[in-house]
Amino acid sequence: MIVDFQFKFSIQQLNNSTPLNTLIVIPARYASTRFPGKPLALLGGKPIIQWVWERVSAMPVEAVVATDDSRILEAVQTFGGKAIMTRSDHHSGTDRCGEVLLALEAQGKHFDIVVNVQGDEPFVKQEQLKLLIDSFANPDVQIATLKKNINSDEELCSPNNVKVVAGIDDKALYFSRQPIPFVRGAEFKDWRQKQQYYKHIGIYAFRTEVLKKLTQLSQSQLEKSESLEQLRWLENGFSIYVKETAFENIGIDTPDELAIAEQALKQSHTNSLF
């Protein structure tokens, strides 16, 4: 079942006046191992997926939720959102985005860029989405994502905060759940004074032809080791541009993180970074 889900957002390439058509997809699955039913869990009295939808749809564009569960589909329709049912055997949100893209193309639609905003990112900012989309003004960009500076040792140590290092050209060199890089000859307590660390903000944008190729790749050993699908892309020679954002995101993977998000929501009126 497909419910009107075309999202178009035009940007101008620096050396090309042709606008790029962008599709944004919000993957949301019910059967999360750590938090079953997560998209429908209440945050500030509304389902998490509704927060994500409202953040994205506040832009003067359309968006779509891609789900494999009728309960999520019905919830989205109830609060006035737009959704599509997808297969239940996808290994990642990226694969789910790929299915949506193919469904649209089968209807004769054309898109240049697909943006993947996970359904557990209730604090996603429009500024972050624009930063990603604007990066495709560079015709060399295949994949774009975000990073934010790490401000505490707790953030640096947590395996739930994925760390990223990038080259001077903004291309990712590696992602890890461990603190990277290692600072030789220094005590851990001094690492952040000697090295700037960044955590990965898991929002992606892809050129459509690249997304199609990514969904055809087999899992890689590095991906399995770290449980990070973006390592599969790096291992297969794709470049990931990493842009820095000042805005904090709180993804929700567990009930404990939902409690943290509740506190952040209460404080959000005094903190412009949310």
What label would you give each PLM region?
Residues T67-D68, V124, F206, D253:
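A conserved hydrophobic position in a structured secondary element of the catalytic/binding core
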Residues M1-P19, F274:
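Short, basic, low-complexity termini and linkers enriched in Ser/Thr/Gly/Pro
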Residues L20-T67:
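N-terminal glycine-rich phosphate-binding loop and ensuing alpha1 helix
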Residues R71-V117, E121-L131:
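Short phosphate-binding loop-to-helix
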Residues R192-F274:
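Conserved alpha/beta core of the MobA/IspD/sugar-nucleotide pyrophosphorylase nucleotidyltransferase superfamily
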Residues K125-L217:
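Conserved core of the sugar-phosphate nucleotidyltransferase
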